[in-house]
């Protein structure tokens, strides 16, 4: 039966290529697929779903890390700490909306001084005229 299948032990073994490397991603596609199946989100999980989810998660992580790195550099630091992540997320409109109800541990609060508490600007002739009327 020549030409039927491969003989056992013949030829070089093929090196396994991960689905992450096939998709050009750093996040683990296989692990995400396993979590999707184990989580019972659906009875069946398509082949492209874990790849797409891994790509989305990788993009979000890269976006947050880039903004947090900028916040760390603005504060003259070389290490990203939770405070930098908090500043990055809350200063970005879309990320702030996405993570609106999320508490970042050790993130602190956003610096904010109410306008009424700020000192009044000198030389405001309109403000003086308004006070004279009342």
UniProtKB/Swiss-Prot annotation:
Function of the protein: Core component of nucleosome. Nucleosomes wrap and compact DNA into chromatin, limiting DNA accessibility to the cellular machineries which require DNA as a template. Histones thereby play a central role in transcription regulation, DNA repair, DNA replication and chromosomal stability. DNA accessibility is regulated via a complex set of post-translational modifications of histones, also called histone code, and nucleosome remodeling.
Annotated family: Belongs to the histone H2A family.
GO MF: DNA binding; protein heterodimerization activity; structural constituent of chromatin
Keywords, comma-separated and alphabetical: Chromosome, DNA-binding, Nucleosome core, Nucleus
Name under which the protein is recorded: Protein H2A.7
Residues annotated as transmembrane: none
PROSITE patterns the UniProt entry points to: HISTONE_H2A
């Amino acid at each position: 039966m020549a030409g039927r299948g491969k003989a056992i032990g013949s030829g070089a073994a093929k090196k396994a290529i991960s689905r992450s490397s096939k998709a050009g991603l750093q996040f683990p596609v296989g692990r995400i697929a396993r979590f999707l199946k184990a989580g019972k989100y659906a009875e069946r999980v398509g082949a492209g779903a874990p790849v797409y989810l891994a790509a989305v998660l990788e993009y979000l992580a890269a976006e947050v890390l880039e903004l947090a790195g900028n916040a760390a550099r603005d504060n003259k630091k070389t290490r990203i700490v939770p405070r930098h992540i908090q500043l990055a997320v809350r200063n970005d409109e879309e990320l702030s909306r996405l993570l609106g109800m999320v508490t970042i541990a050790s993130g602190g609060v956003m610096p904010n001084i109410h306008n009424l508490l700020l000192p009044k600007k000198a030389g405001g002739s309109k403000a003086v005229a308004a006070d004279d009327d009342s």
